[in-house]
């Protein structure tokens, strides 16, 4: 059976699970939250690519005026704004990399790619700064069979040409195109235990060309957001900058830098092979 690391929900029915634990007020909150497209996606499909892309786009939507208002309030939470900051960090790191290597033959990978918005917007930002990307090949790797078609549509609309999709497990080195020059991986780490995260970092390290760059992230706990995640049975692993930096060094990365986003919830990792 294929294991989707971000699908952490175990209960067949969240309302029934809440009822069995006598969390009666949270049953009402559950049905209220479902009016928001963001919350409904999280409740139904855990940390899906659609959940992440909704935050990255930042456009409120939901069932009627109440749903849209509720969605806007959820998107305005510090945890959601910080979640979007990791996308912006990956976009900006990619744009800088493409500008520094303008005109070179490069391979750039997003894993798991979902909707590869950081590639699309990073490339667009680099072009606006004058970078020449004619020899850049963009890649997406994802385990979800729904992703290739949706990722390709996004890539084509964003003028990523060529964009090559690879379906496979991000923790398996055999899934990767290689060698690649730049890898972005945000959003998967928090669903992995330490051993699994080591496997992910190792697979990415093996796929990178010598001198290649890896951009990733981790997040820290915030009370209200953690409470909402628990209602949805979204089980995540929180890590600080020291932990992910040490792990990156342990798999062989020679240059490792970490920084906090402006809200100090997300930690951004930039590592070079």
Predicted regions: what they are:
Residues 30-34, 182-183, 223-227:
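Short acidic (Asp/Glu) and glycine-rich catalytic loops that position anionic groups and cofactors
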Residues 198-213:
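A short glycine-rich, Lys/Arg-flanked "PGG" loop and its adjoining helix->strand segment in the class I
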Residues 184-188:
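A short beta-strand submotif of the Rossmann-like class I SAM-dependent methyltransferase core
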Residues 174-183:
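A short acidic, Gly/Pro-enriched loop at the edge of an enzyme's catalytic core
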Residues 15-73:
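N-terminal, positively charged/glycine-rich alpha-helical extensions of SAM-dependent methyltransferases
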Residues 2-25, 55, 65, 74-110, ...:
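Class I (Rossmann-like) S-adenosyl-L-methionine-dependent methyltransferase catalytic domain
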Residues 190-192:
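A short His-aromatic
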């Amino acid at each position: 059976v294929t294991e989707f690391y971000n699908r952490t929900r175990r209960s067949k029915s969240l309302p029934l699970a809440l009822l069995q634990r006598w969390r009666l007020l949270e049953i009402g909150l559950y049905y209220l939250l479902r009016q928001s497209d963001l919350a409904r996606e999280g409740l139904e499909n855990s940390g899906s690519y659609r959940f992440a892309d909704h935050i990255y786009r930042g456009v409120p939507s939901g069932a009627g005026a109440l749903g849209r208002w509720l969605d806007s309030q959820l998107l305005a939470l510090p945890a959601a704004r910080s979640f979007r900051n990791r996308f912006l960090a990956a976009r900006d790191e990619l744009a800088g990399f493409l500008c520094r290597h303008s005109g070179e033959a490069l391979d750039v990978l997003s894993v798991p790619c979902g909707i590869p918005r950081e590639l699309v917007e990073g490339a667009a930002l680099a072009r606006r700064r004058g970078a020449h990307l004619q020899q850049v090949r963009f890649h997406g790797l994802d385990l979800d069979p729904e992703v290739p078609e949706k990722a390709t549509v996004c890539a084509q609309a964003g003028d990523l040409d060529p964009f090559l999709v690879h379906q496979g497990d991000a923790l398996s080195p055999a899934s990767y195109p290689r060698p690649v020059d730049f890898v972005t991986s945000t959003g998967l780490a928090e669903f992995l235990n330490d051993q699994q995260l080591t496997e992910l970092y190792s697979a990415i390290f093996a796929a990178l060309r010598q001198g290649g760059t890896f951009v990733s992230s981790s997040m820290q706990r915030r009370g209200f957001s953690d409470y909402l995640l628990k209602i949805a049975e979204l089980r995540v692993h929180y890590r600080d900058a020291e932990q992910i930096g040490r792990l990156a060094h342990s798999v062989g990365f020679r240059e490792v830098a970490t920084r906090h986003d402006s809200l100090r919830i997300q930690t951004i990792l930039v590592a070079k092979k």
